[in-house]
Amino acid sequence: MKRYTIGIDYGTESGRAVLVDLENGAEVAEHVTPYAHGVIDQCLPDSGRSLEPEWALQHPGDYLDVLRLSVPKVVEIADISASQVIGIGIDFTACTMLPIDKHGDPLCFDPQLAGRPHSWVKLWKHHAAQDEADEINRIAEERKEAFLARYGGKYSSEWMVSKIWQIFNEDPDMFEKADAFLEATDWVVAQLTGTIVRNSCTAGYKAMWHKRDGYPDDSFFAALDPGLAQLTTTKLRGDILAPGQRAGGLTAEMAETLGLKPGTAVAVGNVDAHVAVPAAGVVTPGKMVMVMGTSICHLVLAKEEREVEGMCGVVEDGIVPGYFGYEAGQSAVGDIFAWLMKHGIPADLKQEAEQAGKPLHSLLEEKAAAYRPGETGLLALDWWNGNRSTLVDANLTGLILGYTLQTKAEELYRTLLEATAFGTKKIIDAFRDSGVEVNVLYACGGLPQKNELLMQIYADVTNLEIKVAASKQTPALGAAMYASVAAGDEAGGYETIFAAAEKMAHTKARSFKPNHENVRLYQALYEEYSKLHDYFGRGENDVMKTLKQLRSRAKGGAVHA
């Protein structure tokens, strides 16, 4: 009898369940449930209370809808029996967090509290805790806290402690009412099993936890505010388990809702980008996974913990048990290309695409591919949404150098592709300079599936082979793979993620190999990129920040330094 697991990938706008064949990793069925409430960034449901700028909330009931609708649907589509499903795995955006009561229910489920914004789920892109993040960084730097170096020198406004402190500052009564603060991935797992456990991925990358040292000392949290002194032993308490461990079994009530068997194994929760690493076939050091979409998340495994300039985090057992998982990233990649499509393409080129019956991006790719490296005469800094790694500075902005009256849209397009590749090379260089090996690249996500020119440019700029994941749903596949490990080999799953990856993870037959002539030409361009990178990014010329300040003053707002 065939065995299957279900991976459930919770995104920003919807959740997707994928049923996976354990024998070969085939994605047999999938179903998407859009979130009924979407991203709540204007006003609260029901009460209509307006939200301040930079807020981004969600309704936890939407997450339950994904379970209730999508899980039974994939079983129905595949026409299999419940007994053939031996495990469930979850991945989620992060840090997406919520306050819960002593029964494990979200505080926003209480009608008395639903009209207060801090009772709701704070989505990963909730940026209203910037003041708290700034103070965390200032105090941590003053105290020389060890955790700060593991985050590339800066703790983000998107992460757990920043968001908790915002709740404490703006609604102290809500802070007191919260029995605990959970990552949404851990809350969904708790709904399935009836037991709350935390995962080492989000605890490490988002909540200051370290496998050997634990959380920072209580004195650090007391330095933030005396009321936070016991935070980690009270509202962040709980067992922290590694990816692939069994969080528990499906409760009888939830089994009935999902149409599965009670006791079905449920894996510890995970994060969407990180869980994609084994799904791309990477379970050993020396290989960098690029999760490529609107932005890029760069993930690397290593045997040792090292400080890498501008990394977003390094966590032991954070991605694959037994290794340190490193994370870095670029704040905008696909979003930059989308910006050009929206604002930088002349009407005649759009008309040409229509007449040829081609998508606009396909025509641009075709035209841009005709140029050799350096032939456009242009160079760009890929900072349209700031710089995440390695400079960790959200107030940097984009730059294009070399315009002439003859510059064409396809030349701009190619230049922006190249700029993002140079940004990735900067990250690779930072890892190598710190002693972390990167010898081959693996790509997954939306971009590698539809832009071959981009992939070839990345191979040429980095002088590395790029292998592309066969799956279009790597997060869900990775969650399903970890579900197979949680179920174990006796149930028909796998003993380790290494064994699961050998059978379930695949790359496409075609890889992208560096063109040696292009490598030589791009090295010269990269040297010029590096000059611009350091000149504008390391403080020699702060014109980008000055322009943002002037723009803000003109609009009557403020900019965080």
UniProtKB/Swiss-Prot annotation:
Any one GO molecular function term: ATP binding
EC category: transferase
SS bond list: none
CDD domains reported in the protein's UniProt record: ASKHA_NBD_FGGY_L-RBK
Protein name, per record: Ribulokinase
Gene Ontology CC, one term: cytoplasm
Highest taxon of source: Bacteria
EC number: 2.7.1.16
Keywords tagged on the record: Arabinose catabolism, ATP-binding, Carbohydrate metabolism, Kinase, Nucleotide-binding, Transferase
InterPro entries registered for this protein in UniProt: ATPase_NBD, Carb_kinase_FGGY, FGGY_C, FGGY_N, Ribulokinase
Pathway: Carbohydrate degradation; L-arabinose degradation via L-ribulose; D-xylulose 5-phosphate from L-arabinose (bacterial route): step 2/3
UniProt-listed GO biological process terms: L-arabinose catabolic process to xylulose 5-phosphate
Family as reported in the entry's similarity comment: Belongs to the ribulokinase family.
Annotated source species: Shouchella clausii (strain KSM-K16)
Catalytic activity: D-ribulose + ATP = D-ribulose 5-phosphate + ADP + H(+); L-ribulose + ATP = L-ribulose 5-phosphate + ADP + H(+)
